[in-house]
Structure formats: C-alpha cells, structure tokens
Amino acid sequence: MNNRVKKIEKDVAKMVGGKRCVGSGNQWFEKSDVQSDVVQMEIKTTQKYKDVVILKRIWISKLMREVQNTSRYPVLVLVSKSRKYFLVMKMVLNLVGMNVSCDRVVDMSIRKSIVVDDYNIGYKLGSHIWVCMCEDDFMKVYNRLKAFSNRDGK
C-alpha cells in the first residue's frame, strides 16, 4: 500500500474519530479500512493522477457482508484525484431523519461497475439504494448517526 492511500485512510479515520484497521482490513478480526463506534468504511482510491473513480458492485456486497455481525453502519468512500464520494444507504439516511432525494438512480444489478462522477446519485443493488454525497453532507449524516446511536445505547 502506498503512502497516499495510508494518508487518505488516516484522514478519513480522523474525520470520524475512528481508527485505520490493521492490514487495511485483511484480518479476520478487523474488516474494512476504517472503523469508528458508528461506521465501518471501505475506502477505494484511483491512481494518483486520475480524476475518474469507478464503483464496483462487489465492493458494496463485500461491505454489506462485513457489517452484518456488527453494530456499525456501512459507508463506502471513493477517492479520485480531486474529490471524495461518500456512499451511504438511503435507509440509514431515513433512520436519522434525512430525507434525501436522488437526481437519478442507477441499477447496479445489471452492471459490474460504473463511473461515479457526481453527487446526489443513487446506486441500487438488491433492495438497497446507496446515495452518493460530498464530505460535508456525509459529516452531517455521521453526526446524526452518532447522536442516534448514543440515544439508543448502541
């Protein structure tokens, strides 16, 4: 793993008051790249000078499996040269009272991967829609999730 990826993981971990996982999540006891008390995050980056980021269906499926036996909410982070895209399940947004509508929804069941190039797009896989948002919007969601989890004793 290169220094750029480590720095991105450390920055995201700091942002959510979490920690970067040992071996970037390849241990049986610590999955994903970043964990906090509230979220479990998988971070995917592009090559250093690319401004195009790809969302792969398998990443969503893997993250969903990894959070199954935890009390954390899944978040997928895609990082290009100039932007970070945070993907959060729409049902999680509804849970914390954030009714977000998407400009469009892309069905991922018929694609293995797709280029992500804008915020406020939904990506549907199975019964879940993952909403793509910017860092500021994600932090609003994260703070509500923290408050919600603390209230419920999670």
Where are these regions (language model features)?
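Catalytic phosphate/metal-binding cores of nucleic-acid and nucleotide-processing enzymes, i.e., regions
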Residues: 1-154
